[in-house]
């Protein structure tokens, strides 16, 4: 059927009649001008894609009527303009695509129908680790090791880029996905197939929201959902509430964008924005650069919103020019946005739209801060850090407690490193990493760090040699301006050499600590510290030996590295003593905003962006030399320990199976609150005594060849064994942290995988019990695929993080939620019961269903299939099964 809104199509420029757009101002509907700008993007996509099948006229009306419909839990479809993937989530996506081609062929269909319809970019940034640091050749050494470890994965991805149309691979060594997206891939306005329309994106990484800072609406989705979008399916989403976040005033001189985002994160966690859009407005926005806005948007998952949108304004347009985008295209971008009423003037309050609610922040009230020691939302003012850490030491085990006995608070362990004697104590910094797209995309904080390093070196300050220091920029542009401005050599003198272009320490690829440091930490049971300019600091994520991890701005990372401890009051205690005996305080070396801006104006210029990005796809010689097969169907290598055909589609037929009641399920694990996807499916090192290690050893590998869980996401045998394998897992069945559980029929304590295998062999279904925020953190599809392979049929939790619930749905695992006011405690659940979950034939979205226990007790829970489309996926056994049946029939 033709588009019912064709009457509002017109050329953007009369001189170019072939280039058209849907002119939303021609709707002549007064509601349009009151819509939040983020909702206008959803509306335009619905109008442009309206076909009365996937997108209906009623969907358009529901979005236009947002002010009323936002409270009605109404489902709307959204077709984003692009998909982005990183390699940890991208490899399993390409594995699934290859396996789907095989499945379609087996069912008699055309395998080449499995092909991205929506354009996809895959940026390889998650594989590189900090094996080498504090040496001039660290970058080359780490990149060589990356290729040695990941050659097979990289060959597979190169095959994918050739076998599938519409899929572009950005090679390793190019930068971090979100920074590359911001500086290079993002268009703001698309010019495709004869139409102009707003750029929008979904990505298989939760920090995809970073590009919201440029005015490109985007957010993270599960890998499974992203695959469906690539195959032309719209995202089915509940029309969101939009919280207006009003920024007022100017930041104080010493405050960085990192301080602002950590303040906003804590504030919005308290407001409660899960499942909502946040849209920024107010005169304070005009004080923020695009890099500052992108930093704030990047940490959107940490405050729990779906998107954190900054509408496009003249500063956004200026950023496109600054980053070397084509000037003619930039002019068209501005002209289009003006025509459709999507160009914002933050100083003009008459443009302020309607919001669900409005909250405010005066930027002048923000003070320098960090977040930690275990969660991004736990903000601590720098002036309070010493006192806060010392309180955490003795506090009860929890997000703000380590339960260290008072008589051990001042324990000191002596150790030798490279022939010199040193001491470690609670609070000693052992990792200091300038890392992560959150901050390395921001010239003001990166140049601030460089200028602070210069002043520190000139004052005679140093960093202790055992501290693992590193600098992993999000793109080559950063190195370019640090070098050109003359600060790179000072960073190197403090140990902050460039170690790679990728996520690195921020995702746990921090590499090993020196043996003597690990021995000292272990001997003293010390709460050692990592300080990083990252976006997440969940327990066990950054490094197994840093129990406390603080998020901080790049200049503060260097300051704490010089101090060597977080038990310092920077206002009263010096960082060190100069050669002349003078006490040097942090305020003595902290650069002013004027100093930073002067350097930024001189050295961050369009030419450097053009130079770096024009050769991004061809500059990596090792990638160019990779040999990849050219077949359209992948030839699986049975000896491979990286790439394996997954069992998800084994035995799939065209006929649907009726979902059955889950009978007498055992509880595999019993969790409390805030179990993250890092707990469920860790990305870091494979422990030598783990089920995954035993499997890899049986395949002839040595521990040096294990690599990380993240790198092995193309192999289901490793990933199933790595499910719930986090060493910091807290399972209520077990009285200590670790990846174990009780196998109830035998009463034995086993590794989680081994227990699940025993249940499976006996034919027993499994469920998981959890508290609030189950599945928080990274958009990790293996956190749903892994439990599915272990035989988990359902999860019963108090609440879910959005992306993880969607991933469970995508795998056909039932997300159940306690009724309001109920939880495991109020219902008296111990997890030792057996659970029968009644699945009625007439399922409806968010239906209350009955659960019977073997004790005779009965209660109800909400089945969190939120839309009719999600129910369709469930009836098919998951979203990918649905797509295969659709393509094969």
Curated annotation (Swiss-Prot):
Binding annotation for [4Fe-4S] cluster: 437, 503, 506
Compartment annotation: Cytoplasm, Cytosol
Keywords: 4Fe-4S, Cytoplasm, Iron, Iron-sulfur, Lyase, Metal-binding, RNA-binding, Tricarboxylic acid cycle
Disulfide bonds: none
Gene3D superfamilies for this protein: 6.10.190.10, Aconitase, domain 3 (3.30.499.10), Aconitase, domain 4 (3.20.19.10)
Note describing how the cofactor binds: Binds 1 [4Fe-4S] cluster per subunit.
Positions annotated to bind substrate: 86, 205-207, 536, 541, 699, 779-780
Keyword Iron annotated: yes
Cofactor(s) the record lists: [4Fe-4S] cluster
Xref: Pfam families: Aconitase (PF00330), Aconitase_C (PF00694)
InterPro entries on file: AcnA_IRP_Swivel, Acnase/IPM_dHydase_lsu_aba_1/3, Acoase/IPM_deHydtase_lsu_aba, Aconitase/3IPM_dehydase_swvl, Aconitase/IRP2, Aconitase_4Fe-4S_BS, Aconitase_4Fe-4S_dom, AconitaseA/IPMdHydase_ssu_swvl
EC number of the protein: 4.2.1.3
GO biological process, one term: tricarboxylic acid cycle
GO cellular component: cytosol; mitochondrion
Reactions this protein catalyses: citrate = D-threo-isocitrate
Gene Ontology MF terms in the entry: 3 iron, 4 sulfur cluster binding; 4 iron, 4 sulfur cluster binding; aconitate hydratase activity; iron-responsive element binding; metal ion binding
Function of the molecule: Bifunctional iron sensor that switches between 2 activities depending on iron availability. Iron deprivation, promotes its mRNA binding activity through which it regulates the expression of genes involved in iron uptake, sequestration and utilization. Binds to iron-responsive elements (IRES) in the untranslated region of target mRNAs preventing for instance the translation of ferritin and aminolevulinic acid synthase and stabilizing the transferrin receptor mRNA. Conversely, when cellular iron levels are high, binds a 4Fe-4S cluster which precludes RNA binding activity and promotes the aconitase activity, the isomerization of citrate to isocitrate via cis-aconitate.
Family: Belongs to the aconitase/IPM isomerase family.
UniProt-recorded name of the protein: Cytoplasmic aconitate hydratase
Originating species: Gallus gallus
Gene from which the chain derives: ACO1
């Amino acid at each position: 059927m033709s588009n019912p809104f064709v009457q509002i199509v017109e050329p953007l420029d009369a001189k170019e009649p072939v280039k058209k757009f849907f002119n939303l101002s021609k709707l002549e509907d007064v509601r349009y001008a009151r819509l939040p700008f983020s909702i206008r993007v959803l509306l335009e996509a619905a109008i442009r894609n309206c076909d009365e099948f996937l997108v209906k006229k009623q969907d358009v009306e529901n979005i236009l009527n947002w002010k009323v419909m936002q409270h009605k839990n109404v489902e709307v479809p959204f077709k984003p303009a692009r998909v982005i993937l990183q390699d940890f989530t991208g490899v399993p996506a390409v594995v699934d695509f290859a396996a789907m081609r095989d499945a379609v062929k087996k069912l008699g269909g055309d395998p080449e129908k499995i092909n991205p319809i929506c354009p996809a970019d895959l940026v390889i940034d998650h594989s590189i680790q900090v094996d080498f640091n504090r040496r001039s050749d660290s970058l080359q050494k780490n990149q060589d090791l990356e290729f040695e470890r990941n050659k097979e994965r990289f060959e597979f991805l190169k095959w994918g880029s050739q076998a599938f149309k519409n899929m572009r691979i950005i090679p390793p060594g190019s930068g971090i996905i979100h920074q590359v997206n911001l500086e290079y891939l993002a268009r703001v306005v698309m010019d495709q197939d004869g139409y102009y329309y707003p750029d929008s994106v979904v990505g298989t990484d939760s920090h995809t929201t970073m590009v919201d800072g440029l005015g490109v609406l985007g957010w993270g989705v599960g890998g499974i959902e992203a695959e469906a979008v690539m195959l032309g399916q719209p995202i089915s989403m509940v029309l969101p509430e939009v919280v207006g976040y009003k920024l007022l005033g100017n930041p104080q001189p010493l405050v960085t964008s990192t301080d602002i985002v950590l303040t906003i994160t804590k504030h919005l966690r308290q407001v409660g924005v899960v499942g909502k859009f946040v849209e920024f407005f107010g005169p304070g926005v005009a004080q923020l650069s695009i890099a500052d806005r992108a930093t704030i948007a990047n940490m959107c998952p940490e405050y729990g919103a779906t998107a954190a949108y900054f509408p496009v304004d003249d500063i956004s347009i200026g950023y496109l020019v600054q980053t070397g985008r084509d000037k003619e295209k930039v002019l068209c971008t501005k002209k289009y946005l003006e025509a459709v009423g999507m160009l914002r003037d933050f100083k003009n309050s008459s443009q302020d739209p309607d919001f669900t609610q409005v909250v405010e922040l005066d930027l002048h009230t923000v003070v320098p801060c960090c977040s930690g020691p275990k969660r991004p939302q736990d903000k601590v003012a720098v002036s309070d850090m010493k006192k806060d850490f010392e309180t955490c030491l003795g506090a009860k085990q929890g997000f703000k407690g380590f339960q260290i006995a008072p008589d051990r608070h001042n324990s000191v362990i002596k150790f030798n490193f490279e022939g010199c004697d040193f001491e470690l104590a609670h609070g000693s910094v052992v990792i200091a990493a300038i890392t992560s797209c959150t901050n390395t995309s921001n010239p003001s904080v990166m140049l601030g760090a460089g200028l602070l390093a210069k002043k520190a070196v000139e004052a005679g300050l140093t960093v202790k040699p055992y501290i693992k220091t590193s600098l992993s920029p999000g793109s080559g542009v950063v190195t370019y301006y640090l070098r050109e401005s003359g600060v790179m050599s000072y960073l190197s003198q403090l140990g902050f050499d460039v170690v790679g272009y990728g996520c690195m320490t921020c995702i746990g690829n921090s590499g090993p600590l020196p043996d003597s440091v690990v021995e000292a930490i272990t001997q003293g049971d010390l709460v050692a510290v990592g300080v990083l300019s990252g976006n997440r600091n969940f327990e066990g994520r950054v490094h197994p030996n840093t129990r406390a991890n603080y998020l901080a701005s790049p200049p503060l990372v260097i300051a704490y590295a010089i101090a060597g401890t977080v038990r310092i009051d920077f206002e009263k205690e010096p960082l060190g003593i100069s050669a002349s005996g003078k006490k040097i305080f942090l305020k003595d070396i902290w650069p002013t905003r004027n100093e930073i801006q002067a350097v930024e104006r001189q050295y961050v210029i369009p030419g450097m962006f053009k130079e770096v990005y024009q050769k991004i796809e061809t500059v990596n010689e090792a990638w160019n030399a990779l040999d990849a097969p050219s077949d359209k169907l992948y030839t699986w290598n049975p000896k491979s320990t990286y790439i394996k055909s997954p069992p998800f589609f084994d035995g799939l037929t065209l006929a649907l199976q009726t979902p059955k009641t889950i009978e007498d399920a055992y509880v595999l694990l019993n969790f409390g609150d805030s179990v993250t996807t890092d707990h469920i499916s860790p990305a870091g090192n494979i422990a030598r005594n783990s089920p995954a290690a035993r499997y890899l050893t049986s395949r002839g590998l040595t521990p040096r060849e294990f690599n990380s869980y993240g790198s092995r996401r193309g192999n289901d045998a490793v990933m199933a064994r790595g499910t719930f394998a986090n060493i910091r897992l807290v399972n209520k069945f077990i009285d200590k942290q670790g990846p174990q559980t009780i196998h109830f029929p035998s009463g034995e304590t086993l590794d989680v995988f081994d227990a699940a295998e025993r249940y499976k062999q006996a034919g027993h279904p499994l469920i998981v019990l959890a508290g609030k925020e189950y599945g928080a953190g990274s958009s990790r599809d293996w956190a749903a695929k892994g439990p599915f392979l272990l035989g988990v049929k359902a999860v019963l939790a108090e609440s879910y993080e959005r992306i993880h619930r969607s991933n469970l749905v995508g795998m056909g695992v039932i997300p159940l939620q306690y009724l309001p006011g109920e939880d495991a405690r109020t219902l008296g659940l111990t997890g030792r019961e057996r659970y029968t979950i009644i699945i009625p034939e007439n399922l409806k979205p968010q239906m209350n269903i009955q659960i019977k226990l073997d004790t005779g007790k009965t209660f109800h829970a909400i089945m969190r299939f939120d839309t009719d489309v999600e129910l369709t996926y469930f009836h098919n056994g998951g979203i990918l099964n649905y797509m295969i049946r659709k393509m094969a029939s």
